[in-house]
Amino acid sequence: MWYLLGNFELIMDKELVVLVDQEDRQIGTMEKIEAHATAVLHRAFSVFIINTNQELLLQQRAFDKYHSPGLWTNTCCSHQRDGEKTLEAGSRRLIEEMGIKVPLTELFTFIYKASFDNGLTEHELDHVLIGYGGKDPKINLEEVAAFNWMPLDEIEKDLKQNPQDYTVWFAIIFDRFYNYIKNKKIL
Protein backbone atom coordinates (compact mmCIF):
# COMPACT_ATOMS: atom_id res chain seq x y z
CA MET A 1 0.00 0.00 0.00
CA TRP A 2 1.25 3.52 -0.80
CA TYR A 3 0.79 6.54 1.47
CA LEU A 4 1.16 10.25 0.74
CA LEU A 5 2.73 12.13 3.62
CA GLY A 6 2.91 15.88 3.89
CA ASN A 7 2.87 17.59 0.52
CA PHE A 8 4.97 15.26 -1.62
CA GLU A 9 6.42 12.34 0.29
CA LEU A 10 5.12 9.00 -1.04
CA ILE A 11 6.16 5.85 0.78
CA MET A 12 5.37 2.16 0.69
CA ASP A 13 5.41 0.10 3.86
CA LYS A 14 5.00 -3.62 4.41
CA GLU A 15 6.18 -3.82 8.02
CA LEU A 16 3.38 -5.03 10.28
CA VAL A 17 2.64 -3.85 13.81
CA VAL A 18 0.67 -5.77 16.43
CA LEU A 19 -2.71 -4.21 17.21
CA VAL A 20 -3.73 -4.49 20.87
CA ASP A 21 -6.54 -3.58 23.22
CA GLN A 22 -6.07 -1.48 26.38
CA GLU A 23 -4.90 -4.61 28.26
CA ASP A 24 -2.17 -5.43 25.67
CA ARG A 25 -4.12 -8.38 24.24
CA GLN A 26 -3.41 -8.86 20.54
CA ILE A 27 -6.41 -8.18 18.31
CA GLY A 28 -4.71 -8.25 14.90
CA THR A 29 -1.92 -6.82 12.76
CA MET A 30 -1.71 -3.88 10.37
CA GLU A 31 0.89 -2.26 8.15
CA LYS A 32 2.90 0.17 10.27
CA ILE A 33 2.24 3.25 8.17
CA GLU A 34 -1.50 2.51 8.09
CA ALA A 35 -1.55 2.17 11.89
CA HIS A 36 0.17 5.55 12.17
CA ALA A 37 -2.13 7.11 9.56
CA THR A 38 -5.28 5.91 11.34
CA ALA A 39 -4.06 6.24 14.97
CA VAL A 40 -4.84 2.62 15.85
CA LEU A 41 -3.51 1.38 19.21
CA HIS A 42 -0.53 -0.91 18.66
CA ARG A 43 2.28 -2.49 20.67
CA ALA A 44 5.67 -0.78 20.87
CA PHE A 45 8.78 -0.57 23.04
CA SER A 46 11.25 2.10 24.10
CA VAL A 47 14.81 1.23 25.16
CA PHE A 48 16.85 3.35 27.58
CA ILE A 49 20.56 2.50 27.97
CA ILE A 50 22.21 4.04 31.05
CA ASN A 51 25.93 4.15 31.88
CA THR A 52 27.65 4.22 35.30
CA ASN A 53 27.63 8.05 35.27
CA GLN A 54 23.82 8.00 35.11
CA GLU A 55 23.88 9.26 31.54
CA LEU A 56 21.32 8.16 28.99
CA LEU A 57 22.42 7.15 25.51
CA LEU A 58 20.41 9.34 23.14
CA GLN A 59 20.12 8.91 19.40
CA GLN A 60 19.48 11.54 16.77
CA ARG A 61 17.11 10.07 14.21
CA ALA A 62 18.35 9.87 10.63
CA PHE A 63 17.45 12.91 8.54
CA ASP A 64 15.53 10.88 5.93
CA LYS A 65 13.05 9.28 8.36
CA TYR A 66 9.40 9.73 7.30
CA HIS A 67 8.56 11.35 10.63
CA SER A 68 10.62 13.17 13.26
CA PRO A 69 13.81 13.30 11.14
CA GLY A 70 16.91 14.69 12.84
CA LEU A 71 15.29 14.86 16.28
CA TRP A 72 16.83 13.46 19.46
CA THR A 73 15.17 10.58 21.28
CA ASN A 74 15.82 7.65 23.60
CA THR A 75 18.38 4.95 22.76
CA CYS A 76 16.00 3.13 20.43
CA CYS A 77 12.33 2.39 19.97
CA SER A 78 10.29 0.33 17.58
CA HIS A 79 7.55 -2.28 17.35
CA GLN A 80 7.37 -5.95 18.24
CA ARG A 81 6.77 -8.29 15.33
CA ASP A 82 3.83 -10.68 15.37
CA GLY A 83 4.73 -13.45 17.84
CA GLU A 84 7.94 -11.73 19.02
CA LYS A 85 8.55 -11.29 22.75
CA THR A 86 9.17 -7.72 23.91
CA LEU A 87 12.70 -8.23 25.28
CA GLU A 88 13.70 -10.07 22.09
CA ALA A 89 12.32 -7.20 19.99
CA GLY A 90 14.17 -4.63 22.09
CA SER A 91 17.44 -6.55 21.77
CA ARG A 92 16.95 -6.97 18.01
CA ARG A 93 16.42 -3.26 17.37
CA LEU A 94 19.17 -2.21 19.79
CA ILE A 95 21.63 -4.27 17.74
CA GLU A 96 20.19 -3.13 14.39
CA GLU A 97 20.16 0.60 15.22
CA MET A 98 22.98 1.07 17.72
CA GLY A 99 25.19 -2.03 17.40
CA ILE A 100 24.81 -2.70 21.14
CA LYS A 101 24.06 -5.97 22.89
CA VAL A 102 23.20 -5.71 26.59
CA PRO A 103 20.60 -7.45 28.77
CA LEU A 104 17.31 -5.57 28.95
CA THR A 105 14.70 -5.45 31.72
CA GLU A 106 11.11 -4.28 31.34
CA LEU A 107 10.20 -1.50 33.78
CA PHE A 108 6.56 -0.67 32.97
CA THR A 109 4.00 -0.21 30.21
CA PHE A 110 1.67 2.67 29.45
CA ILE A 111 -0.46 4.04 26.62
CA TYR A 112 0.19 7.34 24.90
CA LYS A 113 -0.98 9.19 21.82
CA ALA A 114 1.07 11.82 19.97
CA SER A 115 0.43 13.49 16.61
CA PHE A 116 2.98 14.69 14.05
CA ASP A 117 2.93 17.63 11.65
CA ASN A 118 2.66 15.25 8.66
CA GLY A 119 -0.73 13.88 9.76
CA LEU A 120 0.56 10.66 11.35
CA THR A 121 -0.16 9.69 14.96
CA GLU A 122 1.61 7.38 17.38
CA HIS A 123 -0.98 5.58 19.51
CA GLU A 124 1.03 3.01 21.36
CA LEU A 125 0.95 0.66 24.28
CA ASP A 126 4.62 1.16 25.07
CA HIS A 127 6.84 -1.30 26.94
CA VAL A 128 9.65 0.72 28.56
CA LEU A 129 12.93 -1.22 28.78
CA ILE A 130 16.22 -0.44 30.52
CA GLY A 131 19.73 -1.74 29.98
CA TYR A 132 23.14 -0.81 31.33
CA GLY A 133 26.31 -0.24 29.35
CA GLY A 134 28.98 2.34 28.74
CA LYS A 135 30.47 1.60 25.37
CA ASP A 136 29.86 3.98 22.51
CA PRO A 137 27.51 2.50 19.92
CA LYS A 138 28.29 1.56 16.33
CA ILE A 139 25.33 3.37 14.81
CA ASN A 140 23.47 2.27 11.70
CA LEU A 141 23.51 5.45 9.59
CA GLU A 142 20.29 4.43 7.82
CA GLU A 143 18.51 4.72 11.18
CA VAL A 144 20.63 7.05 13.31
CA ALA A 145 22.47 10.29 12.46
CA ALA A 146 24.40 10.69 15.74
CA PHE A 147 24.49 9.72 19.41
CA ASN A 148 25.16 11.46 22.70
CA TRP A 149 25.53 10.39 26.33
CA MET A 150 23.67 12.95 28.44
CA PRO A 151 23.06 13.17 32.22
CA LEU A 152 19.45 12.47 33.13
CA ASP A 153 18.98 15.74 35.01
CA GLU A 154 20.30 17.70 32.01
CA ILE A 155 17.87 15.90 29.70
CA GLU A 156 15.01 16.87 32.00
CA LYS A 157 16.05 20.54 31.79
CA ASP A 158 16.77 20.51 28.06
CA LEU A 159 13.41 18.94 27.24
CA LYS A 160 11.76 21.96 28.87
CA GLN A 161 14.07 24.54 27.28
CA ASN A 162 14.35 23.00 23.79
CA PRO A 163 11.37 20.68 23.18
CA GLN A 164 11.65 21.25 19.41
CA ASP A 165 14.94 19.27 19.42
CA TYR A 166 13.28 16.06 20.63
CA THR A 167 10.68 13.61 19.35
CA VAL A 168 7.20 14.18 20.75
CA TRP A 169 7.10 10.70 22.25
CA PHE A 170 10.45 11.10 24.02
CA ALA A 171 9.17 13.99 26.12
CA ILE A 172 6.21 11.86 27.20
CA ILE A 173 8.19 8.69 27.84
CA PHE A 174 11.22 10.33 29.48
CA ASP A 175 9.09 12.02 32.13
CA ARG A 176 7.53 8.70 33.11
CA PHE A 177 10.89 6.87 32.90
CA TYR A 178 12.77 9.42 35.02
CA ASN A 179 10.05 9.54 37.69
CA TYR A 180 9.92 5.74 37.77
CA ILE A 181 13.66 5.25 38.30
CA LYS A 182 13.80 8.03 40.93
CA ASN A 183 10.80 6.62 42.85
CA LYS A 184 12.04 3.04 42.66
CA LYS A 185 15.66 4.11 43.39
CA ILE A 186 16.89 2.03 40.46
CA LEU A 187 20.07 4.05 39.86
Predicted region positions:
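Conserved Nudix-box catalytic region and its N-terminal flanking loop in Nudix hydrolases
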Residues: 34-45, 55-92, 96
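Active-site segment of metal-dependent pyrophosphate-handling enzymes
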Residues: 39, 53, 95-137
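Nudix hydrolase/Nudix homology domain
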Residues: 4-10, 31-33, 70, 82, ...
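Acidic, metal-coordinating catalytic segment for phosphate/diphosphate chemistry
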Residues: 11-46, 52
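Glycine-rich, flexible loop/turn motifs
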Residues: 26, 36-37, 68, 76, ...
